[in-house]
Amino acid sequence: MISELSKHILAAGGKRIRPIITLLTSKLCNYEGKNHLSLAACIEFIHTATLLHDDVIDESKLRRGVATANDIFGNKTSVLVGDFLFSRSFELMVENGSKQILEVLSSASSTIAKGEVLQLTTVNDCSTSKETYLNIINSKTASLFAAAAEISAILSNKNKLIQNALITYGQKLGIAFQ
């Protein structure tokens, strides 16, 4: 079931921009190890899990012009595979061995969930403020972009100035992307 749904997700396409951010910022930081590869996968697992859950919540039938996983496999399967991807991402974080990276990605995951809840409270509310809308975007999108960039600075043992610059870069890119 996981394999089948995973093939569907891969075939559905997508830009994979979040893991690409991790790969490119690792290069920017002159990182020479291999841990950025599993962390890029971790970032994509988190993102994909949120998409699976989001499609169930929104009762979506299409994503990127292709039938959603929940439309094909059902809500229960989509939620469980999303949970599996979250679990697998945390296994990859632990395997990496950096408590700081675990903290960054755990925080981003929590922020994404809070953004989803906030969005649920504003659905069909035309009086939603610009501030609330930006908070939703920051939570649901920019937080993972920022984390994807920040972990490269951590992996590369860069100072706080560079780490903060990459966080800002990720946040701004995430807002623009949304």
Question: Locations of the language-model features?
Answer:
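Mg2+-dependent prenyl diphosphate-binding active-site environment of isoprenoid biosynthetic enzymes
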Residues: M1-Q178
